[in-house]
Each structure stands twice: as C-alpha cells, then as structure tokens.
Amino acid sequence: FQRIPAANGLPPLLLDGAHNPHGLRAFETAIRDAGIQPAAVIFSCLADKDISDMLPFIRRIAGDAPLFVPTIQDNERAMNGEELAKLLAEGRGPAITQPTQRLSLALKETASFVPAEDADRHPVLLCGSLYLLGEFFNLHPQTLEQELV
C-alpha cells in the first residue's frame, strides 16, 4: 500500500490496488499488522468482478468505519455506486454505507471522519480498483510528486 499524508485539502490516505479477494486478503492482513484502523473507506470496483467473494473482505476492512462507494468515472465497466453500496450495506448494521456519484465527493465526505490526533493510525483507505486509483491520481496529480511515507 501507499501512504499519502494529509495535504491540499485531502485527508491522510492509504491507497491499495486490492481489486480481488486475494489482494483484499493481503491488504486486510497488512493494515491489521500495521495497527491501522480506518477512519473511513472508499471502495469501488468494476461490474465484471465477482463481487460476492470480495464483500466479506471489504466489510471486515471497513469494520464500523463509514464506507463510501463512488461510481468510477469514464469507464463503461464500472459498477454503479448505488448498486454496490446496497450490496456492501447488507450485514453492516448501523455503520454508514454511502454511495457517491464521484470520487471527489467521497474524498470530501471522508475528511470529516479523520481524528485530529493519531491520524496516521486512522487514515482513509482507498481501494478496490486500479481504475479508481487512476482516477484519484488524475484528480490529484500533485500526490505523485510528494515524498512518499
């Protein structure tokens, strides 16, 4: 995974290309081993993925943290955020599962959930699709130039 510190109006982020059950399992293990408890999670994927095998991992990774589900833009294979949010919400109890039209909106929404103290242990996680990460870097190219932590 890649850490991006809070800057330019973005919350502290942890990015990972986990886009299948194997990748999500590895991501889950890595964040658990690092003692990371997400403040919020942004997840999206393509419609041709077998989402049923991915759902348990996303639910465990998010835990009680708010889960924001944008629709990946400019990709006809993208899964609709509202459909995906409905699937992810099942079994999450009162935890927030919120579809958003765009990644930029999800990033704004998640910032308010990051604690003022100990933000390094409570970043916003962004995962589920390499296309989602590509969209993030298109929106925020300056993050590619930052010194990575």
Residue positions per predicted region:
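Nucleotide phosphate-binding/pyrophosphate-handling subdomain across enzymes
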Residues: 1-67
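C-terminal helical cap/extension that packs against the catalytic core
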Residues: 10-13, 55-123
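Short, acidic/turn-prone active-site loops that include or flank metal/cofactor-
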Residues: 43-47, 71-76, 149
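Active-site-proximal loop/hinge segments that shape catalytic or ion-binding/gating pockets
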Residues: 129
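Eukaryotic N-terminal low-complexity, Ser/Thr- and Lys/Arg-rich leader segments
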Residues: 143-149
